[in-house]
Amino acid sequence: MAADTPKTSPPDDAFAIRPAVREDVASIVRLIHGLAEFEKLTHLVQVTPESLAPHLFGDRPVAEALVAERAGRVVAFALFFTNFSTFLALPGLYLEDLFVEPQARGQGIGQALLEHLARLAASRGCGRFEWSVLDWNEGAIRFYQRMGATVMPDWRICRIAGPALAAFADPPRG
């Protein structure tokens, strides 16, 4: 390129995907709150930057995150962790949450995050890349199906949390 060629700045809708760093935790928490609002689950959110940071960047991290940044602002995140398939005898990559701010949607950010995670899963020798979707989120379901994902109709999520978890972990002895 000639020295007198003007430098162009990236378009306003340009974004970059990168691994999250500790300094992104407050932005990730902000986006988690946005996700909870979208899912109508704000009453369940307890996360704070202080409670999340050790799980992503502590001595024994249990999850990882990617962020999408546009014009210096984190506008999307994907939080994921390794699981394991006994049937395949291979690790898997499980996407816990992905959220793109409403004003940043429709620009390929969500798909780019998913493609990045798929490449990461393949490079780590994972046999599966999985996630859950709310049954009422028909737009997301159609999007995932167009990508080639199978929405598993025969499976349901089971969860024990809070007081029920404590009670089950320490049953009365008799």
Cite the ranges covered by each PLM segment:
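Conserved GNAT-fold acetyl-CoA-binding loop/helix
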Residues: 29-55
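A short helix-loop-beta-strand connector motif used in the catalytic cores of GNAT acetyltransferases and
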Residues: 54-67
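A short, internal acetyl-CoA/4′-phosphopantetheine-binding micro-motif in the GNAT/acyltransferase core
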Residues: 98-105
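Conserved beta-strand-loop-alpha-helix junction that forms the acyl-donor binding cleft
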Residues: 131-140, 159-163
